[in-house]
């Protein structure tokens, strides 16, 4: 619709058919009129050829009329041909202008499409770059969290191992202490039992001695 609105006003200003109608409706008139001297010379030649003065003048006037009509027709044909050539030239010029205008519009539309495509490609590239950066950032955060979690787990395992070792050491120490205490108790018990046996033996010996 835009192209038609822009082209049709141009054509309305240069309508070739209006020129043709104007040419066809024009009335051409003879622009050729022989000089009086030439007419007199023609009459004298006819008189010398044997024609009377009246007949010579009649023939001269007739020839003048015929020549004028012939020249008028020739002038009309030449003018019509010139007008046709002018109309054809105007049509060619109009078509060339239309073609140039359409090519310009096509180039402009192509430029617009190309610019839009370039803009879309740039936006896509920016989006890709942004997504890459986001993915890299997310992966970095995940790796960092994993490393931190691994570190925490390692620290926790180390702490547990340390606690276990400390507990084992404490238990071994307690066992050693308990073992020493048991040994001491055995020694004390043996000493007490030995003393008790000695006392009982002494008592028995005394009883046997007196009784």
Curated annotation (Swiss-Prot):
Which Pfam family, an example, fits this chain? CCDC90-like
**Membrane topology category:** Single-pass membrane protein
Q: Does the keyword Transit peptide apply?
A: yes
Q: What is this protein called?
A: Uncharacterized CCDC90 family protein C3H1.08c, mitochondrial
Protein family: Belongs to the CCDC90 family.
Location(s) in or outside the cell: Mitochondrion; Membrane
Q: Which species is this record about?
A: Schizosaccharomyces pombe (strain 972 / ATCC 24843) (Fission yeast)
Membrane-spanning ranges: 191-211
GO BP terms in the entry: calcium import into the mitochondrion; mitochondrial cytochrome c oxidase assembly
> Its domain of life?
Eukaryota
Against InterPro entries, the record matches this protein to: CCDC90-like
* Keywords (A to Z) from UniProt: Coiled coil, Membrane, Mitochondrion, Transit peptide, Transmembrane, Transmembrane helix
Cross-referenced PANTHER family, in alphabetical order? PROTEIN FMP32, MITOCHONDRIAL
* Residues forming coiled coils: 105-143
A GO cellular-component term linked to this record: mitochondrion
On whether Mitochondrion is a keyword of this UniProt record, the answer is: yes
